[in-house]
Amino acid sequence: MCGIVGIVSSEDINQQIYDSLLLLQHRGQDSTGIATMEESMFHIYKAKGQVSTAYRTRDMRNLVGKVGLGHVRYATKGSAESIEEAQPFYVNAPYGIVLIHNLSLIHI
């Protein structure tokens, strides 16, 4: 079980994603992450723990963009202590993609 939010707006959305994740906090308390996109550049911040303690002002200032995703994780597989397993995931091939999911992939 996780909490997922996505926003597309004509204005910067980092605060709206943060506020949405606070409302979704009951869906997962192991880690949290936000990814935003400004023009063609992704900005990503991930942390262990709850939303209210994970983000500082300087982190939020770096999450500029009008498109974004947010995630709170309840670890059902893998390690709750691993920041590498916190989402969003970013892959830089061939052009870059940010992914958030709420499922288990088994035997693929």
Question: Language-model segments: what does each one mean?
Answer:
Residues I106-I108:
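Conserved small/polar residues in nucleotide/adenosyl-binding loops
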Residues M1-N102:
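N-terminal glutamine amidotransferase
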